[in-house]
């Protein structure tokens, strides 16, 4: 108790010493500490893993070469592939069938239009689609039509097959309801090619390796109008595609960018002769000129061409009426391939061998079927050039004259000023008896004194009335009609041919035509395009006699109207000689009056029989002959009212081409006519006219007026630059110098940017 005991301090010192030794030992042997475990958000972790795995998979696929070469060029393009029309029957009907190949992705009747997609196809050896969207834009509301549904499907086989609605459903497909906008999106995996996801660009190679997948659109059920008890006649959808095409392996083949596509309504036939199925089209049709021998190697032998054409029966005229066994399924499928039979006479219709698949066409294995009698039907055919035997640059192999112009020359542009139209024109109706087919009475002029209700627009006593708003400015006593594809159009400068044109894109005036049928009047049936008028004698020759004038109008039909036969008063011009003696024969006066046609069994009427009906987009010529006024500058005048005698002096020299047809009562139902028309003057200066023609030639459209008009050429979008390049190249190819072509291209682009603001 007398102080701290020494024996108690010893253990404490020993403890400190032991602690020091332990620290030294720990420094020599470091302790492995347990790492802190990280627990991330599960959602973030899953997303991270998916991206990581996809990235690694893509990396490994590219590393191992499963996706082929790396894309060297890519372009995104929008294109209209056609319109979907009404179904004419209950069964599945093919509306559109088109390859996704970049050279074949063209609008109907686009010809050899050279776009960015075709430009790339002409320069690269491999192609593929990264993505594709197909948009259906309705042209009619859902309440206007009923009875039909449409199905778009992807065909990877490059050949037609037996089509059923259930079979189409077994493909990758989507159904589209009428009247609603719809977009179908396809991804890279749906469109991949056979060569490490790539397709060959050269369509002369095996079809399964080059042409790519097809888009097919079918309709089921007859399309009818909900407003009236009748079939629907208008289009239902416009179909557009937008996709991104990728290219690799540069390999220039210029001809692949110039493959053509043409759509035409014409008479086509199918037959089986000597065991081979043959398709025939008229020699003067646009399709025959399109699928001509200019694409073939020169030969005089009777052989088969090398160019392959895809034929799509969009009008279903052959599909519904032709069934050659055992290949009924091929025609019913709505599309096939053909090659031209060479060495045939130039004065006969053009024949093509039919093939069931692209591979058969490439290997020249035509369809072999039982003998089948030739069947001809009117239908709408779409022809697409699949390949070009010569893929190099085009060279002129034959020319006529010293201008190195290769024939045949395709028509381009619309006529300017006075022009001529030559073609087979058909009488609208014939005169006959009920139940008896009319054969020769071609100029029955329907004359009716009864008029529609006062609430409607006024009409004349004749079958057709030319109107400006609600004012009568002319009448049509007779009518012939023709298809624009069967007409030749040209302009003359004295004795020289100054233009070889087409009626595609020709403008119309504000004058309209009303058509009086049996129990209704079709207002706005057509619009006036051009006209002409000529007198047979003047007041100076016979002041006391009524003036005989012939006036006719070229009109473009707007409405498809199916008339019905009916009995009506019909008159016809009848030329005759007055009573005269032999001594007075040299001074005899010819006269013209209008005589009423009568039935043989009596009565003052005759049946108007309509054997053919013009369609929307066709053209017609209506005329009136007799006493009336007319202004050539405006195309307006007065209708013929007087039916009294007209004196016709001798030695008349006519210049219009219509007198013989207007003065005859008996003749063939159709004949070839050549008519002279006057095109109304457009108040534009020379520069405006040239720019308008360039716009029509290259299918350019003005930009919105609110776009930046002050931007320079360097601010143009790539599409604008390409359009400017198209204009420049076209002007250079026509023989203009660089400075003139470049200046004109810039002027056109500035006008396009101004739009309609002016």
From Swiss-Prot:
Pfam families in UniProt: Astro_capsid_N
Effect of residue 519 to T: In strain: VS34
Annotated Basic and acidic residues bias: 21-32
Annotated site residues (Cleavage) in this chain: 298-299, 347-348
InterPro entries associated with the record: Astro_capsid_N (IPR004337), Viral_coat (IPR029053)
Ranges for region Disordered: 21-43
Annotated stretches, region: Inner core: 63-255
UniProt keyword tRNA-binding, yes or no: no
Effect in UniProt of substituting residue 4 to K: In strain: VS34 and Isolate ITA/205.18-5/2018
Record flagged with keyword ATP-binding: no
Effect of residue 561 to A: In strain: Isolate ITA/205.18-5/2018
Keywords, in A-Z order: Capsid protein, Clathrin-mediated endocytosis of virus by host, T=3 icosahedral capsid protein, Viral penetration into host cytoplasm, Virion, Virus endocytosis by host, Virus entry into host cell
Location of region: Basic: 1-62
Effect noted on mutating residue 70 to R: In strain: VS34
Consequence of changing residue 613 to S: In strain: VS34
Disulphide bonds in the chain: none
Additional comment: The Human astrovirus VA1 is a neurotropic virus.
Family per record: Belongs to the astroviridae capsid polyprotein family.
Name the UniProt record assigns to this protein: Capsid polyprotein VP86
Phylogenetic lineage: Viruses, Riboviria, Orthornavirae, Pisuviricota, Stelpaviricetes
């Amino acid at each position: 108790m007398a102080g701290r005991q020494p024996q108690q301090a010893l253990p404490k010192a020993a403890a400190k010493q032991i602690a020091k030794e332990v620290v030294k030992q720990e420094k020599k042997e470091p302790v492995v500490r347990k790492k802190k475990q990280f627990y991330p958000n599960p959602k973030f972790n899953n997303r991270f893993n998916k991206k990581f795995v996809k990235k690694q998979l893509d990396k490994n696929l590219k590393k191992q070469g499963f996706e082929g070469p790396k894309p060297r060029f890519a372009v995104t393009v929008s294109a209209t592939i056609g319109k979907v029309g009404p179904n004419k029957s209950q069964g599945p009907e093919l509306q559109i069938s088109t390859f996704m190949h970049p050279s074949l992705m063209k609008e109907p009747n686009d010809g050899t239009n050279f776009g960015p997609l075709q430009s790339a196809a002409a320069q690269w050896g491999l192609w593929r689609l990264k993505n594709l969207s197909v948009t259906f834009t309705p042209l009619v509301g859902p309440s206007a039509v009923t009875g039909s549904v449409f199905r778009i499907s992807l065909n990877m086989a490059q050949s037609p097959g037996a089509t059923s609605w259930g079979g189409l459903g077994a493909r990758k497909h989507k159904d589209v309801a009428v009247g609603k906008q719809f977009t179908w999106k396809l991804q890279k995996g749906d469109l991949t090619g056979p060569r490490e996801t790539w397709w060959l660009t050269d369509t002369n190679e095996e079809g399964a390796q080059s042409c790519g997948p097809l888009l097919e659109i079918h309709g089921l059920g007859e399309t009818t109008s909900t407003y009236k008890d009748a079939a629907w006649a208008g289009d239902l959808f416009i179909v557009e595609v937008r996709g991104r095409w990728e290219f690799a392996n540069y390999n220039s083949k210029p001809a692949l960018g110039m493959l053509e596509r043409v759509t035409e309504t014409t008479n086509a036939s199918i037959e089986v002769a000597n065991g081979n199925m043959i398709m025939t089209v008229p020699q003067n049709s646009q399709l025959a000129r399109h699928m001509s021998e200019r694409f073939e190697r020169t030969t005089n032998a009777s052989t088969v061409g090398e160019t392959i054409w895809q034929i799509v029966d969009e009008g279903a005229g052959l599909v519904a009426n032709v069934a050659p066994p055992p290949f009924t399924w091929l025609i019913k499928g709505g599309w096939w391939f053909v090659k031209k039979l060479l060495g045939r006479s130039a004065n006969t219709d053009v024949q093509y061998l039919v093939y069931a698949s692209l591979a058969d066409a490439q290997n020249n294995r035509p369809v072999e079927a039982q003998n089948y009698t030739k069947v001809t039907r009117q239908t709408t055919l779409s022809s697409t050039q699949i390949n070009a035997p010569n893929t190099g640059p085009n060279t002129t192999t034959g020319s006529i004259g010293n201008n190195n112009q290769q024939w045949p020359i395709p028509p381009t542009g619309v006529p300017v000023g006075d022009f001529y139209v030559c073609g087979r024109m058909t009488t609208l109706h014939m005169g006959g008896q009920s139940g008896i087919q009319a054969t020769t009475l071609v100029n029955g002029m329907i004359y009716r004194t009864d008029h529609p209700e006062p609430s409607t627009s006024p009409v004349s006593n004749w079958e057709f009335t030319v109107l400006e708003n609600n004012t009568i400015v002319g009448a049509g006593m007779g009518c012939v009609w023709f298809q624009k594809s069967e007409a030749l159009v040209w302009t003359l400068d004295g004795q020289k041919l100054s233009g070889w044109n087409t009626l595609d894109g020709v403008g119309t005036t504000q004058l309209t035509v009303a058509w009086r049928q049996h129990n209704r009047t079709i207002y706005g049936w057509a619009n006036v395009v051009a006209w002409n008028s000529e007198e047979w004698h003047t007041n100076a020759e016979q002041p006391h006699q009524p003036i005989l004038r012939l006036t006719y109008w070229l009109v473009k039909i707007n409405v498809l109207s199916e008339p019905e036969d009916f009995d009506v008063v019909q008159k016809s011009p009848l030329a005759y000689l007055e009573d005269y003696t032999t001594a007075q024969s040299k001074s005899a006066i010819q006269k013209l009056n209008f005589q009423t046609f009568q039935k043989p069994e009596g009565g003052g009427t005759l049946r108007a029989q309509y054997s053919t009906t013009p369609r929307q987009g066709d053209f017609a010529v209506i005329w009136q002959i007799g006493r009336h006024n007319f202004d050539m500058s405006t195309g307006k005048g007065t209708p013929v009212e007087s039916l009294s005698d007209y004196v016709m002096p001798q030695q008349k020299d006519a210049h219009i081409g219509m007198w013989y047809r207007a003065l005859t009562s008996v003749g063939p139902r159709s004949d070839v006519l050549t008519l002279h028309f006057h095109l109304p003057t457009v108040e534009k200066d020379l520069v405006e006219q040239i720019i308008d023609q360039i716009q029509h030639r290259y299918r350019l459209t003005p930009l919105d007026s609110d776009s930046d008009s002050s931007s320079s050429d360097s601010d143009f979008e790539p599409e604008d630059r390409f359009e400017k390049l198209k204009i420049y190249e076209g002007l250079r190819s026509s023989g203009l110098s660089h400075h003139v072509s470049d200046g004109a291209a810039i002027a056109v682009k500035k006008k396009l940017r101004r739009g309609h603001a002016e």
